[in-house]
Amino acid sequence: AIIEQLPTGIFFTEKKPVIGMVHLRPLPGSPLYDPKTMDMKKIISMALEEAKILQDAGVDGVQVENMWDIPYSKGSKISHETTAALAIGLNEVIHHVTIPVGVECHMNGAEAALACAVAGGAKWVRVFEWCNAFISQSGYIDAIGGEVSRMRSRLRAEQTVCFLCDVNVKHGSHFIIHDRSVEEQAMDVEAQGGDAVIVTGFDTGTPPTVDRVQSCKNKIELPIILGSGVSTANAKELLMHADGAIVGSWFKEDNNWKNPVNFQRTRDFMKAVEELRGELK
């Protein structure tokens, strides 16, 4: 299975699609929000600038998220103002670029993200914990697949929005399910109706091992997406075993997610991916 075959509205013209990240600056309601130095107008302006750089550098899609809203609220505790601001930022990005756009709302705010996606026209939602559970920096995170899949049905969005679901996601403790392998968790996502599986390393900037990616690939038919640590140096090796990648830190100056997107870093990465695509033809 390859991601462009998903019957859920995503459309990428190339194999091994690469999704770049647009990290919205602190949104209204979050502790770091400062309307004097970074109001919504400036937040949107910066997001549009970075989305355009990513598109011009050759990425196949972008994902918008509220990464700066630390410390994160969880699930149903995510505030209305966060959802509203994320929806506005997402909608602006969607209308500013011609490539597909997705969304994530921290922490595991898949219902808020789905509401934004349906309202604005995003093609996918990243879900940190579709099934099973883990301990995040925000505390215990429970599975949300049952609730958000029913919400998608109520909104008649089965053919327009898909769920990209992490397994053994970065930045968390998975001791409570340590007797379940990553491969078994990937099989759970497939059995429980997820549309794709995201495989990560331990934290942002750390890649998954080739063995982890390939072992998941061997067990399921869903697309496998790399979710952390992909760089110009390892992109070809890892993407040989995966169907796509979400790249955040590597496209930023000094490999730091808090810094601006850098065109040349992104372009160099995409050249490596384009070489791989040529070799696979």
Q: Where are each of the predicted segments found?
A:
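A short, charged/proline- and glycine-enriched loop
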Residues: 14-17
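Alpha/beta enzyme core
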Residues: 19, 24-76, 81-101, 108-222, ...
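A general marker of short, structured functional hotspots
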Residues: 7-8, 265
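Short gly/ser/thr-rich secondary-structure transition/capping motifs
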Residues: 2-3, 226-228
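Eukaryotic N-terminal low-complexity, Ser/Thr- and Lys/Arg-rich leader segments
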Residues: 1-7, 280-281
